[in-house]
């Protein structure tokens, strides 16, 4: 039964460190690709998944009176704030004051804005695309954290709900975001509900976050509360999920293949699975003759 124990056996509990009652900022990035949500709906209702996520957000807010939450939607062609709303008129219009008067106002505000925002994004999509603007969402999340931390003392972390696979063209901007989060000591946690993503797996490993693969989406809330609810200060004393084998291979920009050996552009660092005359990203021309000689030696 040792594997079911949550607390570490020999954890040195530093009372002075953990007594620091610093509030926490949780920035959530929701994959809002409609095609991915449609695929997930065959296993579990979309309303059930979103309800579990909003319950998790409310639990974070309830844990400390100064805890804060921000929610961004990573759509197929844009990134949008769901909470807090950047448009005051949208905030007033979408939060119904007559609903459940006994509910804590901030809980109701988060629920209404997140659910209505996701519904609006999915219903407004008229084309099917298997991509998501994860690099743009990470950039905006880091910018928001930097803005908030300049005014308040907070422990910040990012949580990504992933349903769509990697987009090869976003490799470099995603890696730039990972290095920025690593420098700022901001963990990137990933809850992979559907599909697989090498980029985000590497992001969690590089920033000291948690990469959690959800095998049964019907129990999403239990996954979230048991594995992703504690902040980085408490995780030192818990047996949190770890990544035994992290796949550090890159994806080629031309055919989106996972490579063991590839060809890298010396200018923009784009990766290709075969020799090319010029780089399709920065249009740099390569000297093919010396390269072909090296390949045959």
Curated annotation (Swiss-Prot):
Q: What are the subcellular locations of this protein?
A: Nucleus
What Gene3D superfamilies does the record tag this protein with?
von Willebrand factor, type A domain
Instruction: Tell me the GO molecular function terms.
Output: RNA polymerase II general transcription initiation factor activity; zinc ion binding
Q: Give the keywords, sorted.
A: DNA damage, DNA repair, Metal-binding, Nucleus, Transcription, Transcription regulation, Zinc, Zinc-finger
- Primary subcellular site in the record, as a coarse category: nucleus
Superkingdom, taxonomy of origin: Eukaryota
Q: State the InterPro entries in the record.
A: TFIIH_Tfb4/GTF2H3, vWFA_dom_sf
Pfam families with a match to the protein in the record: Tfb4 (PF03850)
Q: What are the boundaries of the C4-type zinc fingers?
A: 265-282
GO BP: nucleotide-excision repair; regulation of DNA-templated transcription; transcription initiation at RNA polymerase II promoter
Question: What GO cellular-component annotations does this UniProt entry give?
Answer: cytosol; nucleus; transcription factor TFIIH core complex; transcription factor TFIIH holo complex
Q: Which family does it belong to?
A: Belongs to the TFB4 family.
The protein's job, in short, is: Component of the general transcription and DNA repair factor IIH (TFIIH) core complex, which is involved in general and transcription-coupled nucleotide excision repair (NER) of damaged DNA and, when complexed to TFIIK, in RNA transcription by RNA polymerase II. In NER, TFIIH acts by opening DNA around the lesion to allow the excision of the damaged oligonucleotide and its replacement by a new DNA fragment. In transcription, TFIIH has an essential role in transcription initiation.
The protein's assembly and partners? Component of the 7-subunit TFIIH core complex composed of XPB/ptr8, XPD/rad15, ssl1, tfb1, tfb2, tfb4 and tfb5, which is active in NER. The core complex associates with the 3-subunit CTD-kinase module TFIIK composed of mcs2/cyclin H, mcs6/cdk7 and pmh1/tfb3 to form the 10-subunit holoenzyme (holo-TFIIH) active in transcription.
Stated name of the protein: General transcription and DNA repair factor IIH subunit tfb4
What is the species listed in this Swiss-Prot or TrEMBL entry?
A: Schizosaccharomyces pombe (strain 972 / ATCC 24843)
């Amino acid at each position: 039964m040792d594997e079911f124990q949550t607390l570490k056996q020999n954890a040195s509990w530093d009372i002075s460190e953990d007594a620091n009652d610093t509030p926490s900022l949780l920035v959530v990035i929701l994959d809002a690709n409609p095609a991915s949500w449609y695929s997930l709906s065959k296993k579990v209702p979309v309303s059930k998944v979103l309800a579990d996520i909003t319950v998790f957000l409310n639990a974070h807010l309830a844990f400390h009176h100064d805890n804060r939450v921000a929610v961004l939607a990573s759509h197929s062609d844009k990134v949008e704030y769901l909470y807090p709303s950047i448009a005051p008129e949208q905030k007033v219009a979408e939060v119904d004051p007559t609903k459940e008067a006994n509910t804590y106002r901030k809980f109701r505000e988060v629920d209404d804005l997140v659910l209505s925002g996701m519904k609006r994004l999915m219903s407004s999509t008229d084309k099917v695309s298997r991509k998501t603007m994860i690099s743009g969402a990470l950039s905006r999340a880091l910018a928001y954290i930097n803005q908030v931390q300049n005014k308040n003392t907070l422990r910040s972390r990012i949580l990504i709900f992933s349903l769509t696979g990697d987009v090869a063209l976003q490799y470099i901007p995603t890696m730039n975001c990972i290095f920025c989060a690593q420098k700022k000591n901001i963990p990137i946690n990933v809850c992979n509900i559907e599909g697989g993503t090498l980029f985000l797996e590497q992001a969690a490993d590089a920033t000291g976050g948690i990469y959690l693969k959800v095998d049964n989406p019907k129990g999403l809330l239990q996954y979230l509360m048991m594995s992703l609810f504690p902040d980085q200060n408490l995780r030192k004393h818990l047996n949190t999920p770890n990544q035994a084998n992290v796949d550090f291979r890159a994806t080629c920009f031309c055919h989106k293949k996972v490579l063991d050996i590839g060809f890298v552009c010396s200018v923009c660092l784009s990766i290709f699975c075969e020799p090319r005359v010029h780089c399709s990203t920065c249009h740099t021309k390569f000297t093919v003759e010396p390269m072909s000689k090296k390949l045959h030696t």
